Amino acid sequence: MDQYEILGALGKGSFGVVSKIKRKEDGRVLVWKEICYENMQEKEKQLLVNEVNILQKLKHQNIVRYYDRIIDKPSSRLYIIMEHCSGGDLSQLIKKCRNERTYMDEEVIWRTLLQILSALQEIHNRKDGVILHRDIKPGNLFLDENKNIKLGDFGLAKILNESLYAHTFVGTPYYMSPEQIHGLKYNERSDVWSVGCLIYEMATLSPPFEATNQAQLTSKIQVGRYNPIPSQYSEHLSKVISLMINVDPKSRPNVNELLGYSFISFKVKERKLNIYYQGLKQMDEDLKIKEKKLSDIERDLQVKEQHLLLREQQINQREKLLLDKENFETQSRINIMNQQLQQQQQNQLQHQISNLSLNCNNSVNSCSSSSNNNTTNSINTQQQIHIQHNTQQQQQQQQTFQPYQIKRTFTTPLPNFK
């Protein structure tokens, strides 16, 4: 129960309250029927269990949708969670028309009839057993936000598993069939009688059979006489009502036979076409909405693209400025390095020139000194040679001629001889 939030009460019955609730996980608005079963008799408890079992089986666009059940044993309460019908019920619509003294449009009546028959076709033709509603009345026919009919309140419904007939006296007297009010066997055609009474009330704004006491009402229902519907309605509507409010259940059509009636069959096809065209119209509207959304998205993308282009231009400009700045700084560093290198080279060159000049001076001095020494040495050598030569001549003069010695003397190289 913590997963639901109570929004407010919608109605109150003999065994509990019907409240509008909101499912917290998704915010969906639903209804729960709170039923206290503590003081119920076994028969009533069985009807309650029966309703839940039937609701679990039914999934149809014209039947109130069942979602879940919660059993609170400490408080002896059962919560049946169902679809919320925001349009109220058919009894409220009839009361409104009665107060305003206006008749319903015939197309509204036909649409209601076709939707009720669609719901009954679902429950009367089930393979796992025919389901009788047994309490069809304006208060049990709900309207959604689009004014579509939803058959609800299956508290008196019965599944015919073993027999084609039921015997129990249940239902609302104004809408009960003759066989049902007399305690005779009845089947799904009894629901058709109730639908006939309901459609009649939509046209005339009052039930076909009214009385001040049960006996009088029973007598009128047994006879089956009622006042004609207002003349503003078609003969087809009057004919269909007379088919449904037929005291002889064997002559009264079932749902499938009613849907096969020519005018109703035509209305069914017309309704299907209307639903189809409404679907196309809705698809067209949805497409227009999607196109508008896509157009808005495209426009937003264009704006974003322009912003991105502008941003890209700004970034490119910044990158260019940064690159120019970086190139300028790099070139400046290169220029400084070149200047430093040139200065270093100049310094080295000057140093080399200075060293070279110093070396040259030293060389000159050395050469000058060496030249003087060489000159002196040369003079001394020449003097020595001259002296030696003279000595040799003297020796030759003193000695006898010896060819070998002469040859030896002349083949010996002379130092620094020029």
Swiss-Prot record:
Keywords: ATP-binding, Coiled coil, Kinase, Nucleotide-binding, Serine/threonine-protein kinase, Transferase. GO terms for cellular component: centrosome; cytoplasm; nucleus; phagocytic vesicle. Residues 4-264 form the Protein kinase domain. The keyword Coiled coil applies. It comes from the Eukaryota. The active site is at 135 (proton acceptor). It holds the Pfam family Pkinase. It is an enzyme of class 2 (transferase). ATP binds at residues 10-18, 33. Residues 278-363 form a coiled coil. InterPro entries: Kinase-like_dom_sf (IPR011009), NEK_Ser/Thr_kinase_NIMA (IPR051131), Prot_kinase_dom (IPR000719), Ser/Thr_kinase_AS (IPR008271). GO terms for biological process: centrosome cycle; chromosome segregation; microtubule organizing center organization; mitotic cell cycle. Its EC number is 2.7.11.1. GO terms for molecular function: ATP binding; protein serine kinase activity; protein serine/threonine kinase activity. It catalyses: L-seryl-[protein] + ATP = O-phospho-L-seryl-[protein] + ADP + H(+); L-threonyl-[protein] + ATP = O-phospho-L-threonyl-[protein] + ADP + H(+). Involved in centrosome biogenesis. Seems to be required for recruitment of centrosomal material and might be involved in de novo centrosome formation. Belongs to the protein kinase superfamily. NEK Ser/Thr protein kinase family. NIMA subfamily. This is Probable serine/threonine-protein kinase nek2. It comes from Dictyostelium discoideum. The lineage of its organism: Eukaryota, Amoebozoa, Evosea, Eumycetozoa, Dictyostelia.
